[in-house]
Amino acid sequence: MRCPFCRHEDTQVVDSRVSEDGAAIRRRRRCSACDKRFTTYERVELNLPAVVKKDGSRTEFDRRKIVASMQLALRKRPVAADAIDAAVARIEYQLLATGEREVRSEKLGELVMNELRGLDTIAYVRFASVYRRFEDVSEFADVIEEFRRASPSKPSRKR
C-alpha cells in the first residue's frame, strides 16, 4: 500500500485487529521510507441501493454522509465512534436485507433516527428536529413526551 505522506510503495503492517462490530479490519502500517505510521481499514464492499431524493434525483449511497449526519447529531454527546460505526453498519445491513435497488431518502432518514434513538435520546431529538423540520417548540415537546411514555421514569439530574 502506498504511503499517504511520501507516496512510497513499501509499507509494513505493524498491527491488525478486527473492529468492535466485526465489520472491518483495522491495520496500523509503517512506511519503510519515511517511517511514519498510518491506519487503514479493510471492509467488505457492498452493493447498497441508490438513494432517491425528494426531488426524484438519484445518488449513490454514501456511508460518509450517514456517519457525518450522525456525528453532527451526537456532537458533544458521550457516544464512542465505534458505536456510530456499528449503527451505520446496521443501517447498511437493513438496506441490503431489503434486496431493493433503490431506497427513498425518507426511509433512510427513518433508519438513522431509529439508530440514534438507541444511542442517545438528545441526538435523536436533534436529528428529528432537522429531519422532520420542526417549526415550533410544541413539536420538540411532542417528541420528548413520546420518550417519556415509551421509557420508564428516571430520576432527574440536578445541575
Curated annotation (Swiss-Prot):
Gene Ontology MF, one: DNA binding
Zinc fingers typed unnamed, residue spans: 3-34
Swiss-Prot/TrEMBL cofactor(s): Zn(2+)
Cystine crosslinks: none
Record has NAD as a keyword: no
GO biological process: negative regulation of DNA-templated transcription
Domain ATP-cone residue range list: 49-139
A Pfam entry, by short name: ATP-cone
InterPro entries in the record: ATP-cone_dom, NrdR-like_N, RNR_NrdR-like
Alphabetically ordered keywords of this record: ATP-binding, DNA-binding, Metal-binding, Nucleotide-binding, Repressor, Transcription, Transcription regulation, Zinc, Zinc-finger
Co-factor: note: Binds 1 zinc ion.
Chain's role: Negatively regulates transcription of bacterial ribonucleotide reductase nrd genes and operons by binding to NrdR-boxes.
Cross-referenced NCBIfam families: transcriptional regulator NrdR
Entry similarity comment: Belongs to the NrdR family.
Name of this chain's protein: Transcriptional repressor NrdR
Organism: Burkholderia ambifaria (strain MC40-6)
Gene: nrdR
